[in-house]
Amino acid sequence: ALPVFCTVLPGIASPQGEIAQKSLDLFKTGCELGAYFGARGVLDNGPLVPYEFPADMPIHRHYSPDVLRNVRLPQRLSWKVYWDNLLSRMDTACKFAADYGLNYYMHPCVGSLTDTTNGYLLLKEELGWENLKFNFDTSNLYYMHENLSLGLLKLGKDLDYIHISDSYGQR
């Protein structure tokens, strides 16, 4: 069996509804595939901040600080509207995962809203889904200046999946 099935769908966090819906549809397919392969969960990067990326830029699993320095937020972005829509989409994603008996793991990475345990815990508190979990990626969290010991303590029962890596948080 596959321990975790990885989906990388930053469009779930898109402020553009049609992009987000397409990503949610793909996420549901990812849940179906994960369950088929016997995974205990699906993993995605945490919701990406709604930056405006160049249209011809490919999707990356990790965005470098150099890339993020050269993008900006949409001029007319309303944080409240964006946050409410994001919570609705994340709620749907958690439900899809639960429907397939899967945990939904948030992967911390530069540029996401869950790049630290605090970001994840805020999202978890807002959503309340028991199957929403955090991928404790030691390298990425170290890169984000997370106190690893404190992060482990804060996660408590949400500590379910640890990725021990040595990539300086950049791969």
Residue ranges and their predicted role:
Residues 4, 8, 94-97:
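Membrane-targeting and insertion segments and their boundary/processing signals
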Residues 113, 117-121, 140-171:
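Gly/Pro-rich active-site loop or hairpin
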